[in-house]
């Protein structure tokens, strides 16, 4: 981010605050930066907005792949190991060692009372980022008192493609967050 801010300044666009956002894997990265890296950010992060970004990796949430079943624990460890870059074994699930191993790739595990405000959208028929994982993130933000809005697209898969009204509300809320958390200078 330092390089982005420096290059923008060089081109005549001073950056003195930012919002960060993304979708799918980009949403995962946006959440990680927002919850994990804001203390080191060269400029303040006003809020994060994302859609369908994976935020946690618990086998019981990934039942759409059958990874919640005891006989699939080795497959779950393999998939989550690839996704997080961690060396995982089935016996780690449900332990503090598992959380520690996947923390660098799991935005959920970085949520604190100091997390930035969040606008997020998830889909109940998503086969890429299981909806159950988003419920954990919504709950963590609520439990920590973090201002957030969670939009649920009840007819869509990974792309919010069947819930245009929900998607419109999501985008309108992003605009409201801009006004609230990053108002233009007078």
Task: Give the ranges of each region predicted by the language model.
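Alpha/beta-hydrolase superfamily serine-hydrolase fold, recognizing
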Residues: 1-186
